[in-house]
Structure formats: C-alpha cells, structure tokens
Amino acid sequence: YITLEEELELIGRYLAIQEVRFGDRFVCELDVDERFQHCVVPKLILQPLVENAIIHGVADSDEGFIKLWAEEDVEGYLLLKVSDNGSGIPPEVLERLNSHELIPGGHLGLNNVDRIVRLSYGESCGLSAYPNEGGGSCVQLRLPMQKGEDHAQGTDR
C-alpha cells in the first residue's frame, strides 16, 4: 500500500511513457485535492484504469481527453474516478463490470483491480463504470478513506 500522492507520481511516469508513444493525441488531467493525497491505496491500482482509458478510450482519437479525480461519497468513502471521451464501454460489458462478473475476452485489468479492492476492503468497495453524457466512459473505484497513519496503525495488530 502507498499514499495516493505516491500513486499519482507513478501515474505521471506512466503518462510520460504514453506521451512518447501517442504524442499529443490525448491529454490527461489529474485533479486530486490535497486532502486526499495522504489516503492509502493499493499500489498500482490506478494504472490499469488509466491504461484502459488510453487503449480503449482515446488511442484511436486525435483529440482524446482523460481526467482522473477524487471525491468523498456521502458515506465517507474515497472515490477515484477515471473518465475519457472515447467510444465508451459497451452496455453488456458495463453490466458485467457493475455486477462484478469476470468479462471474457478482455478487460482483465479492470477485473483484477475490482478483485483486489473487494478482497482487500470487502463487498462495499470495488470498481463500477458508467457512460458519460457526452460520450466515453467513467470508471470509479470506491475505497475506504484511510490516511497513512490510520493504515499503519491498523497493520500493526
């Protein structure tokens, strides 16, 4: 486990590699408020979501846009969201993702992220996805809001 701040640094490095590969065919905006930076997340949990947004969302576009941001839901959970303006996730895949079923023939990264989160934190956490109004998709992770100090205390038991 690492802080969200550290995870975002890893995402920045991953995006630098993708910028070499894709040039200026997409832009990625990271918009995570300071109050979430010290939350603890599983290491490399966001990379598959960003990779999925690039490969399935904007790789075939000349004007791709990806946004990653964090929110707190009404129950106090951390929501990490990755949105793109691509062609969107097919409805049958959305249905399987949102019911936490394995998706045959692809989306292995999303399945793995969902399983890691659900095994680590329980059934109230995990991955969900939905279409964006203007096109594209948004994939959301729901995690407990644990600060680095809280997590360290919890693992000393």
Question: Which residue stretches match the model-derived regions?
Answer:
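Charged/polar, low-hydrophobicity segments characteristic of intrinsically disordered regions
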Residues: I89, Q146-D150
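Two-component histidine phosphotransfer core
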Residues: Y1-Y130, G136-C138
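Short C-terminal beta-strand
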Residues: S137-Q146
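Gram-positive cell-envelope targeting signals
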Residues: H151-T155
